[in-house]
Amino acid sequence: MKQFSEATRVQMPAMVHLTRIGYTYFGKLSEDKNGTVYDGDTNILLPIFEQQFKRLNPEHEGEYLQVLKDIRKELNDDDLGRGFYNRLKAVSPVKLIDFDNIGNNTFHFTAEFTCKNGQDEFRPDITLFVNGLPLCFVEVKKPNNHGGMLAESTRMNKERFPNKKFRRFINITQLMIFSNNMEYDALGGIVPIQGAFYCTGARSYAQFNCFREENSSNQKIAPYNRDYRYEDVDKVVEEQILSDYNCQVIHTSPEYQTNLDVNTPTNRVLTSMCSPERLLYI
């Protein structure tokens, strides 16, 4: 690996930042864990999903496997994930997320987790899980990457969304974030050139949207980000993340330390859109 790449400049710092906002690093996932640690049809983390399902639905513990089967079926429907979304928001007869008490849910992340159906596959840079459900993924590029974020938009809209083999993974994903860790620049405010953008699933085309935190007094850092109660970084977890992705060499580099700042464009948008209270609200 080159010493400075999209992984070292954006991906690794973003993963460490997620630990500051309430996420637990799940560890690196490989295909040999399919069927035991995760379900390859949906990329649901099986032990976490089972544990949380039984915790949130103590009177329906025996229905865990049937619900998992139902989710598998729903995700193959050509409905842009509407069926799964309705299940996700439901509170009766069973619930997958506790929207009233955030503390009853678990939040995990991993990286380079392959979404595979037959011979077709793609691998988001970072995947976020709520109660074991892969509800969000993040794609990162290094600053000033060739083609800017327009290249990422083109890849999603021409390669991933139209591919029916990816439908199940798009249907379960509620939020997609794309960033090259730069401040916004867009042609006429429409075409994504640089910055951090988001979209939701689509059959063929999804517009990349800007996210700007409320900042009525035009402060340098928006109040939500400025006042957020970040957790301290656990150095052992940080070292594990870097080790899992062969990035130990960057640990003491000035560039890596700079990109760990909570107020980089990527880290700001993660706080704004993926902090547990915000993600469940969105």
PLM-predicted stretches and their roles:
Residues 1-282:
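An alpha-helical interface "stripe"
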